Amino acid sequence: MRGKKFISLTLSTMLCLQLLPTASFAAAPATDTGNAGLIAEGDYAIAGNGVRVTYDADGQTITLYRTEGSGLIQMSKPSPLGGPVIGGQEVQDFSHISCDVEQSTSGVMGSGQRMTITSQSMSTGLIRTYVLETSDIEEGVVYTATSYEAGASDVEVSWFIGSVYELYGAEDRIWSYNGGGEGPMHYYDTLQKIDLTDSGKFSRENKQDDTAASIPVSDIYIADGGITVGDASATRREVHTPVQETSDSAQVSIGWPGKVIAAGSVIEIGESFAVVHPGDYYNGLRGYKNAMDHLGVIMPAPGDIPDSSYDLRWESWGWGFNWTIDLIIGKLDELQAAGVKQITLDDGWYTNAGDWALNPEKFPNGASDALRLTDAIHEHGMTALLWWRPCDGGIDSILYQQHPEYFVMDADGRPARLPTPGGGTNPSLGYALCPMADGAIASQVDFVNRAMNDWGFDGFKGDYVWSMPECYNPAHNHASPEESTEKQSEIYRVSYEAMVANDPNVFNLLCNCGTPQDYYSLPYMTQIATADPTSVDQTRRRVKAYKALMGDYFPVTADHNNIWYPSAVGTGSVLIEKRDLSGTAKEEYEKWLGIADTVQLQKGRFIGDLYSYGFDPYETYVVEKDGVMYYAFYKDGSKYSPTGYPDIELKGLDPNKMYRIVDYVNDRVVATNLMGDNAVFNTRFSDYLLVKAVEISEPDPEPVDPDYGFTSVDDRDEALIYTGTWHDDNNASFSEGTARYTNSTDASVVFSFTGTSIRWYGQRDTNFGTAEVYLDDELKTTVDANGAAEAGVCLFEALDLPAAEHTIKIVCKSGVIDIDRFAYEAATLEPIYEKVDALSDRITYVGNWEEYHNSEFYMGNAMRTDEAGAYAELTFRGTAVRLYAEMSFNFGTADVYLDGELVENIILYGQEATGQLMFERTGLEEGEHTIRLVQNAWNINLDYISYLPEQDQPTPPETTVTVDAMDAQLVYTGVWNDDYHDVFQEGTARYASSAGASVEFEFTGSEIRWYGQNDSNFGVASVYIDNEFVQQVNVNGAAAVGKLLFQKADLPAGSHTIRIVCDTPVIDLDYLTYTTNA
């Protein structure tokens, strides 16, 4: 096992870091006998606060160390200095010339030490100067600057690679934070596990350019800590911070675009910060943020954040474009009662982007209508926000028609559209306003003043804060086309300053939909969004990242979705909601809004350095509020959820104080009398546990109930079925004062329950014996109850059972055994919804719909339309209905009607994700209902609809049965060949290479699936169900095994037959699965 390398340093050893007097040259190598074996003799070294850097002149490598107390922890392997890329190859033939060390300098981060390394390439003649600076102030940070001098001829470089660091001490896994903005975070998740035990090779480019704004930072870390590398620039520029898996670790580096280095000239290629840190990415990002402060990129101070930035918010986007002024005003009483203090008027209020004029269809009386809305909001004690898109000048706008000189022009002289991440387009995005055109920025300021002074809004939600295309407009006199991209934040700065001039307490949010935020926009906002996360764990991890970059006090929002509530509250996020809530959804919202309003963790101090994501047993977050520590532990959606129930450790408490641990969601004590220096306890939870540590001066007398959340069933309960001879026993030490015992061999008791856990409580005594315990007719263990007399003992428990009906049976095998009580954790069986695929003939389509395909869809296909008013309709008999669709930035909005009544507008626009529950309505009366999905704006789509059929009893749980290709139940016709490989389900498969060969299987169930291969030499098969042709399946494609090739659901109850016929060889069968009700 490779552990951390930790070596003690004496004072005399530390003094060895002071290699030479100030401004000395041609420095002698370091001599560090106290660290023999770690620091090689002859290496050069500099040190700063929490960091040490050594340079091996012979190997031309840099090694980073983290100092901890009086010791060193090696963080990087000896890593090469970066080089120029010429002709597709990195130049690496540099020879050492000199290494100069200054022990006391004033550098970019103030006082520290500096090392200057000079070397020359034999093949190109380039002289490289590599400068490293440490800081006495910023912990763990190293500043690096690189320059090149050309010799007698020009040198054309396509790319410059700066610092490169390979992590030291990795074992089975590394975690990587990736701030690049080249694509939506659904696919380019910011936090990824690099599994060193698999055969894959992790690689992320992490780009920032004219199509991708980003956090220009990457981090790799293990349990001992990690290394962060980020761009050290006061303005945005093109930069990559790639992370690449190596043979036994991973490396992080930085690079910038190439240039032509003219003969005899010197160019600076780029500057960067590296941070060595303990813990996870939070510490790395915080170190980067602190270093960037020295470059003038400074985040808002706590005093600059208005109270409204911490308020609970509701947004009109839940109605899409179908809102009206009166509809919003009519909602205010309800929202005020729920504790909402902020209202956002979202998209749909304006005529054209760029003009940002009130839409007369929404505001027939113009500004007076806008004031009617904002006045009503203010009368309810709320603030009013207005949605817009900064930098967007529109396409059909008056602004573009009258002032085309304000706009970015591409290389062909055409107006350039604002890009989506990675360089795509979006129908809602217009032409880009150039930040170097004075009139362009003035137009943004004019809008801000109009919205605040004439319409009464208190702040703004800026959306689509992605990147800015390069500008070739000759009227702007750009130093280079990249200047428009590099200066994009000027629009944000000037707009924000105009907001503050109108109201010092103005609210301003900028949102990078689905990508990391533009780092250079951060100083100009008072709240930051987690930006369209697609899972709860993405929400939590982004909160932690932005708290590191903005400050522990800075308000961060979660997304508007009910499953986000526990993640928002526990991480100290600001809750926002957009839906027109009713029924159980409204009750859930009011519950969590009430909890959030009580604890107010969004106003607390986020503490991000106590737990390491990916290495502590649970995904954990901590917020301190008014002197009380709040902890949030999560398993739902986590990338590394533990097995079982590890002990929970509360870090950061006062070691000299005693605490009671309270689950503040359910108002229950989960542990008590814990000292801060050993605050460890154990409790069971499913998705999350949110607790606070309450200081107590005296120990609590009452123990914590271990059966909290369990239902107790006494020995006399009629649900218990006794067989054989049993006797009643009465004693105050028993639960309810009674128990039942037997000394008859094979006497038994049976108890059936619906739940996920079961416990048997009884006695131990010297005359007691043994009992067999059966669970669902399977012998689990033999319990020995013989021992010192004790009542109320948990003699057996089974936890984490499937949510289903179970039976426990206790059989006496020797001596005496007794039953005091059972305790079980109840579960409500999820009702079984009947699914109706988009291609089902049960769905009626009106208008122009087209079929399209994706393996992630329910049945591999969906329907879409962009025709105005086109609709899809399903009639069903049931008590609940759900509608599933794909989300994408290419989709718009749709109206949902239920039994002819408009009930909701759904938003399909957003972070790319398939199989999304877009609409749900429960509690319908039994009988026939009709759901209709109607196109409202842009493209819409439908994956499937599910409904809960009428039923008197819950549908039994479904069971999935797997049938291997070699199973005797399968009937093969024609020539089939056996295939053996460990990639197959059971190591075997069968394939047909002749047309007409078939395989048939009879089953009883409601769903059937065929799994097999795709390959470039495979062909086509026809699938029949109950002798009726269903689908032709094309299995030709890129090689892949274990693919779901065919699926048929919604089969009526009963026996069915599937037949697969080879039309064009080759086809294969790995296995079938079918679903039946147990």
Curated annotation (Swiss-Prot):
Has an N-terminal glycoside hydrolase 36 domain with a probable carbohydrate-binding domain in the C-terminus. The C-terminus is not required for activity on soluble substrates but increases efficiency of cleavage in red blood cells. Keywords: Glycosidase, Hydrolase, Signal. One of an enzyme pair that work together to convert the A antigen to the H antigen of the O blood type, which together release galactosamine. Catalyzes the second step in the conversion, acts on the product of the first reaction (FpGalNAcDeAc, AC P0DTR4). Is specific for galactosamine containing sugars, does not cleave GalNAc residues. 5 ug/ml of this enzyme pair converts A blood type to O blood type in an hour, and can be removed by centrifugation, showing the pair can be used for production of universal type donor blood. The keyword Hydrolase applies. It comes from the Bacteria. DNA was isolated from a male human fecal sample of AB+ blood type, the sequence was given to UniProtKB by the submitters. Residues 306-570 are annotated as: Glycoside hydrolase 36 domain. Its EC number is 3.2.1.-. This is A type blood alpha-D-galactosamine galactosaminidase. GO terms for molecular function: alpha-galactosidase activity. Optimum pH is 6.5. It catalyses: an alpha-D-galactosaminyl-(1->3)-[alpha-L-fucosyl-(1->2)]-beta-D-galactosyl derivative + H2O = D-galactosamine + an alpha-L-fucosyl-(1->2)-beta-D-galactosyl derivative. It holds the Pfam family Melibiase.
